[in-house]
């Protein structure tokens, strides 16, 4: 995996693991403090609940706007429809899992093709493993680890077919899990230590030593205060609105009605819906402030 050059514009495209914005700051900080490249810009294009399909749908709005030269792409856990594993084995379950996998392959291939057509250098990351075997308070889905192994293997194949660079997150994290608790009780999302480790893995692939583990530096706080609500708006589009190209007025009316009726669909969505109603009208300003605070505070 080559280092990003001077003046590169690097988008990190992925799901909630990317959107959490707990790995990218370490990569930016390392590039900055070790003076690896000048004039470089990094952009968080992660979406909680995101899939390769949603990345294609939101591409022009959320990815192409940054005029990227490089893209680091990681999807799989949401594309897999892993919750089907909670159902008893049946032909219907098998068919649904297979359909999800075929859909993932088609959308990942199309996403890479679009990035290449736009002249963007692509690094594909295999999805992080589903941590099926570490004991936790939350019961694991039987077969989750094997499911994500299949998705990781496809990404390895796709990288070879398309001539992209590859960062094999799945293999490296799977190995480390034997002795290092990197993933939280939900078996999917990293711990804070896990997010740092992801940055270490990516940078190590570029021949860069991140150094000792540390908290995210304070100078990222203002930038993150704009990244977080914007990523939440996109997550709401993906998981709740589910009609990205509908008129904004229609989407705002639907989400405002949910707030008025306290209709959250499920409790975890309350924060997303409230954030959407507050910040969707400010979406363009959030993008502007992300760029401004990056320039003023970070790089």
Kindly give the residue locations of the regions a language model identified.
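Charged, glycine-enriched surface loops/patches
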Residues: 90-125, 154, 158, 162-164
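Active-site segments of SGNH/GDSL-like serine hydrolases
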Residues: 74, 78, 87, 111-146
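Flexible glycine/proline-enriched surface loops and loop-helix/loop-strand junctions
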Residues: 138-141, 179-187
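Serine-esterase "nucleophile elbow" of acetyl-processing enzymes
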Residues: 1-48, 53, 58-71, 198, ...
